[in-house]
Each structure stands twice: as C-alpha cells, then as structure tokens.
Amino acid sequence: MAETEIQTSLFEFTGNHLCLDFTNTVQDRYTSPRELLNSYSDLVLWSQEAQLLTADEASRLREEAKRRRKEAAVVLQRAIDLREALYRIFLAVARGSSPEKFELSTLNTEFSEAMGRACIVPVKDSFTLDWTDKEKALDRMLWTIARSAADLLTSEGLDDVRVCAADDCRWLFLDTSKNHSRRWCDMKSCGNRAKARKHYTQKKQTA
C-alpha cells in the first residue's frame, strides 16, 4: 500500500533543504492554491518521502493516528501553521526584508518542543542527534523540520534562499548553483514554461 501511495504522490522535492521542501506543499500558492497536506496521512507520506520516516515507522504512525484521531488533527494543524510561518519567514529572507515576530514565535515554539526531545546517541565511532520517545509521537516529523529551519536560518547559506521566478509557482529553494544565479525551483517545469511563454510573446509581437 505504501508503495502505491508513493507512486501516485504529488510531492516534489526541489528546495534543496528540508524545511524549504516542506514550505512547498502548496501548489500554485498565489493563483489557484492547492493544498497537498489534507490529512495526517498526507503529512506522514510527505515525511516518508522526505526520508524522515521509514516505511515501517510511517505505517506505525498511521495506525497510531487512527487510535488518536483528535491528536492527529491537532498535529496536522500545527504542521500547516509551521509551514505557513516558515514560508513567510524565508520569503522575507529571499526578498531582503525582516519576518514578522509572530512568524518567528511559531517557529520558536516548535523548535523549543524539538529541542526538549533532542538527545545525543552514539553511532559506530561517532555520535548523532536523535529524539527521545519518538516511536509513538505523532508530531515527530515537526521536530526535524523545525531543527532544519533553525539550521538554515543560522547558516551562511541563508543568503542563497530564493523564491521561484514563475508567477504561478513562488516555491522556495536554496540556490546551490555555481554562480548562484538560479531563478527557478525546477528548470524542467517552471523554467521551461517561462521560456515557452517568453518565446510565444516575442513571436506574437513580431507577427
């Protein structure tokens, strides 16, 4: 069942950073908005595709959510609130302006929750950050998303956050191109559409 869901998924990962990919779970935000996180199961599926959950972990969370439907609904709303706050924060960054305090407050609330769950665990000859009591935590994916946002906001890469130049897209992405001149979240879709429109307009003007 999980394999079928992934094959028919509408999620795309063109942001080059986890938290930016999460903000891009709304299609055509400024024209004909299409919400991609319509249920807690959708949130779990996105988390699985983003490699935050294994297939077994995703399956367990779905079963857990069936037993805790009200809590799952609250987590979904928290996820959407966090996503919208992150979108506005990084949109402001991309445009060279300052985000609103209430948007940062939303992020800080989730980040504080995440850090309260953080722990350092040994892995082979090294150590890594993990989360305590995560197995049945319906909001466990939010911890990693909030940490991802905090990492990006405090990194040198913050200056490379961009907003897609396509008017019908406006997704966010991290520009990792060599000369930092990337304009589109995905050249194959938004870039090609923009070039086609430009060519059509020029051809019409010279006709």
Model-derived regions: residue spans:
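Short helix-coil boundary/hinge micro-motifs
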Residues: M1-D160
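Cys/His-clustered metal-coordination modules, chiefly Zn-binding fingers
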Residues: T128-A207
